[in-house]
């Protein structure tokens, strides 16, 4: 929907774009109501959502002709994560899990190649550890926005198509995690696309090299930035199904015992 707003602006449909932006805000406010939070928490979060909503509406104002460039695209795209991270952290807190939203743009430093920005890993690690490690050491779960970074001067960037996996790998690398779990809509990595081939078989175990070779052969396995980070830190990567969490999925690591299901 947010990317659709950018397209509407390109077409000069500013009023429709503004209506869509308001619909995004209303949707998140409705989700907030559904969470049934304690009054003080509800009111605080409602104010945060409305504040972000005003920022979103400012990007699609009717009285000024908006220049629709890659930088605006990234700013618009970022609002979904920034809103949902707050709601998810609140839901966790209400369920008894200490959690806070964290803006990845506060520590993921990137170049200014908007829509396909590359992270500056060393500086990202330093900044990320300063923010994330104290939270983790205090038993607080950081709910970090995905696929978003920022330039040195604070302009919002995104790291390209399907870069949420990459964001997760960066965060795992920053905190020196032993495991990274990628939640998707399939049961793991297959020998072929299971939607296209009845002969596709689920792979239970893969090495980094095997997963990389499969990706280079054209398989839509993981974002290409995930495996280099995982192999550098000997991190185990799991690919599992969000809708069937009881299944083991595929394990990618330094070594494996092999196996097609």
Segments (PLM) and residue ranges:
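A conserved regulatory-domain signal marking ACT and ACT-like small-molecule sensing domains
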Residues: 251-261
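Nucleotide/pyrophosphate-binding catalytic subdomain
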Residues: 1-222, 226-227
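A conserved active-site cap/scaffold subdomain adjacent to cofactor or substrate pockets
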Residues: 207-253
